[in-house]
From Swiss-Prot:
Cofactor: binding comment: Binds 1 pyruvoyl group covalently per subunit.
Biological role stated in the UniProt entry: Catalyzes the formation of phosphatidylethanolamine (PtdEtn) from phosphatidylserine (PtdSer).
GO molecular function, a single term: phosphatidylserine decarboxylase activity
Source organism of this protein record: Clostridium botulinum (strain Alaska E43 / Type E3)
Enzyme class: lyase
EC code: 4.1.1.65
A GO biological process held by the record: phosphatidylethanolamine biosynthetic process
Protein name in UniProt: Phosphatidylserine decarboxylase proenzyme
Superkingdom of the organism of origin: Bacteria
Length: 296
């Protein structure tokens, strides 16, 4: 059972995991683990399924998916019948008013919908993946020079489920630099997998860039792919100023993760998020929601 903290009700909720039985089988049984290593983590598996999700035939899955996971389609720009494929539905745009953004320059917002965990005063060589498992920032981005800038800083992990809105956005106004791509595997980023695969974020396909934000310093942004995520699509234009809340990109089908690293003494994360993170619980958040305040 995966429990997440609802910041509004201040209660814990059980996450309705898409493909839960399959995920538990592939990451918790000997046979499943073997299949994962031989097939599921490979690019060809995710590419093949991704191609299917681009077909018109895959659109037949949409109504059941919406019903099973209680997805609110009233906030989507398109009706269910208007999507050409499952991926078209998966990367759906939302009505702008459905995700209000706090324009106060001192407020740090969530870059997307998902479940958030935050660690402060991070040790660059022992960043927490999940309780008991760690990785290093050097391994994650393969750049020693940039890594040192985030010593004792903040690490924000936003885990997206297949049921979530899968576009990610800029948390402040500023100038985004070019994207660096790192090849890797396609393990699931579900907590079940995170408990089973050491240094999973460093094993998976990922992309990173520096965002020169106007209020929170240079933010290191990392997007991590996962099983069935055929593509991480960056839609922004490098070295051109963007406004807070502007779209940065999106993930095609599958669960996936966005990780932000902020320099020391740039932001104070909201107390409820920090407290839940220390207890091992993720907090459910929406794009545009306040998650921290600038340190003045």
């Amino acid at each position: 059972m995966i429990k997440v903290y609802n910041r509004i009700t201040k209660e814990y909720e059980e996450e309705n995991v898409a493909g839960k039985k399959f995920i538990k089988w592939t990451y918790e049984t000997p046979v499943g683990k073997s299949i994962t290593e031989l097939i599921a983590k490979r690019k060809i598996f995710s590419k093949f399924y991704g191609k299917f999700c681009d077909t018109k035939r895959s659109a037949k899955k949409i109504p059941d998916f919406v019903e099973n996971f209680n997805i609110d389609m009233n906030i989507a720009e398109k009706n269910i019948s208007d999507f050409n494929s499952f991926n078209d539905f998966f990367v759906r745009n939302l009505i702008p008013t459905s995700r209000p953004i706090d324009t106060n320059e001192n407020i740090l917002i969530s870059p997307g919908d998902g479940r958030i965990t935050v660690y402060d005063n991070i040790d660059l060589d022992n960043i927490v993946q999940i309780k008991g498992l760690t990785y290093s920032l050097r391994e994650l981005i393969k750049n020693d020079q940039i890594t040192e800038n985030y010593k004792d800083g903040i690490c924000i992990i936003l885990r997206l489920c297949p049921t979530d809105y899968h576009r990610f956005h800029f948390v402040d106004s500023g100038i985004p630099c070019e994207t660096h791509k790192i090849k890797g595997h396609y393990y699931s980023v579900n907590p079940i997998a995170l408990n089973s695969i050491p240094k999973l974020f460093c094993e998976n396909k990922r992309e990173w860039n520096i965002f020169k934000s106007e209020n929170f310093g240079d933010i290191l942004t990392v997007e991590v792919g996962a099983t069935c995520v055929g593509s991480i699509i960056q839609t922004y234009e490098p070295n051109k100023r963007v406004l807070k809340g502007a779209e940065k990109g999106y993930f095609k089908f599958g669960g996936s993760t966005t990780i932000l690293f902020l320099e020391k003494d740039k932001v104070k994360i909201d107390n409820d998020i920090l407290e839940q993170s220390k207890q091992g619980y993720e907090c459910k958040v929406l794009f545009g929601e306040t998650i921290g305040t600038k340190i003045l």
